Swiss-Prot record:
<dbReference type="GO" id="GO:0015979">
    <property type="term" value="P:photosynthesis"/>
</dbReference>
<comment type="subunit">
    <text>Part of photosystem II (PSII) assembly intermediate complex PSII-I; crystallized from a strain without psbJ, it forms monomeric PSII before addition of the oxygen evolving complex. PSII-I includes 3 assembly factors not found in mature PSII (Psb27, Psb28 and Psb34). The N-terminus of Psb34 (this protein) binds to CP47 (psbB) in close proximity to PsbH on the cytoplasmic face of PSII.</text>
</comment>
<comment type="function">
    <text>Involved in photosystem II (PSII) assembly and/or repair, probably in conversion of late PSII assembly intermediates into mature dimeric PSII.</text>
</comment>
<dbReference type="GO" id="GO:0031676">
    <property type="term" value="C:plasma membrane-derived thylakoid membrane"/>
</dbReference>
<keyword id="KW-0604">Photosystem II</keyword>
<keyword id="KW-0602">Photosynthesis</keyword>
<keyword id="KW-0812">Transmembrane</keyword>
<comment type="similarity">
    <text>Belongs to the Psb34 family.</text>
</comment>
<feature type="topological domain" description="Extracellular">
    <location>
        <begin position="55"/>
        <end position="56"/>
    </location>
</feature>
<keyword id="KW-0793">Thylakoid</keyword>
<dbReference type="InterPro" id="IPR048028">
    <property type="entry name" value="Psb34-like"/>
</dbReference>
<keyword id="KW-1133">Transmembrane helix</keyword>
<protein>
    <recommendedName>
        <fullName>Photosystem II assembly protein Psb34</fullName>
    </recommendedName>
</protein>
<dbReference type="GO" id="GO:0009523">
    <property type="term" value="C:photosystem II"/>
</dbReference>
<feature type="topological domain" description="Cytoplasmic">
    <location>
        <begin position="1"/>
        <end position="33"/>
    </location>
</feature>
<keyword id="KW-0472">Membrane</keyword>
<feature type="transmembrane region" description="Helical">
    <location>
        <begin position="34"/>
        <end position="54"/>
    </location>
</feature>
Amino acid sequence: MRYTTDEGGRLNNFAIEPKVYQAQPWTPQQKVRAALLVGGGLLLVAGLVAIAVGVS
């Protein structure tokens, strides 16, 4: 376990830092999947708003 000791003798624990990496550009398949998820979400929200307007 990694820790440091300060002047008063107290121990400070530090979390293990994850490895940092740069994100890769999206593949065409990932772009299509993201577009479908966004479209489905918009349809869901539009449908719920339409139901709310219809009920009120």
